[in-house]
Amino acid sequence: MDFSLSEEQELLASSARSLAADLFGESVARQVLDGDRARADKGWSQLQEAGLASLLVADEHGGGGGSLLDACLVTTELYSALAPVPYLTSAVAVPLLAAGSGKDATAVLTAVADGATYGLFVGADLSWPSAGPDAVCLDWIPGRDGLLVGPDALELGPAEGAPGVDPLHPLGRRIGVGGSSWSAPDLAAGSRRAVAGVRVAAAAALTGCLAGAAQLAWDYIATREQYGKPIAAFQAVRHMAADLLVDLEICRSVSLGAAWQVENEPIEDAERIAAVAKSWCGEAAVRSIETSIQLLGGIGVTWESTAHLYLRTAHQLAASFGGTRSLLRRVGADFIAARGGHSDGSS
């Protein structure tokens, strides 16, 4: 079996990488930190014009008809470039959940294809039916509604800003009710695979954070000199840099492999694979970004370094869509249940 990317997927990733480098990066991220979203919003509009924001919307609704793997490739490149845009929510999670809810969600899908932007309301541990008045809105943008997924309906509702750890992807809190709503009687059946897809996309975003932070560290140790030579010449530093590469390549393989499996495997396997992928990438990304900061030395812990932006985004992603402990606890419970509720005590 050939696990390599197709020529079209290689081209998609390359195009997304080039576009992200042109539209975003440290200067745009710094402007957002200062409260100026003009360039970030312009970049988001250009992603929409390029068709990347509607990649997961089916052809019949005006989108690109892409796969989850395609969306994960783009997600990784955008997060590596510190893109302060709602790609993971508006371009990935919302289309997946709307498509999984049945034919009555056509209005949401068509709106995304036409350029509408939504945040995403989630309850604790991604428990969509319980995402009530206290639900957190991910990727909150002032003046934009968030999509709330209920037991048998989709609803757009307003939100206001809320404290969060990641300034590039701010949080909101729901304020009252209102907005459009759509009946979605098939939501319970379709949302399981959609939620699995969202978790895999989050794993791809974490991979992007790790890629960006690792590149910062590699560039630094190649040029920073001590005792008359680059610090990359010292064995201890080389080992740390190599560990970054190992974690990065594993995260990349895990997220992309899981993307294919979630779309093609039975739902029980898809949910387990997505949970493990999200858990692994969450822990690996945070751990390795912290290693990147250590390689950067004193500058790595300053406001002037961009390393803290990658770390803050990674922490928020790791806690979103199900934290590591809750996901692995669920995987373990399912494993025990499959064995008849018994354990032989072996590890």
Predicted regions and their residues:
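N-terminal glycine-rich flavin-associated loop
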Residues: V85-G102
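Alpha-helical interface subdomain recognition
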Residues: M1-Y79, R199-S347
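Amphipathic alpha-helical regulatory segments at dimerization interfaces
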Residues: D22, Q46, L96-A99, A111
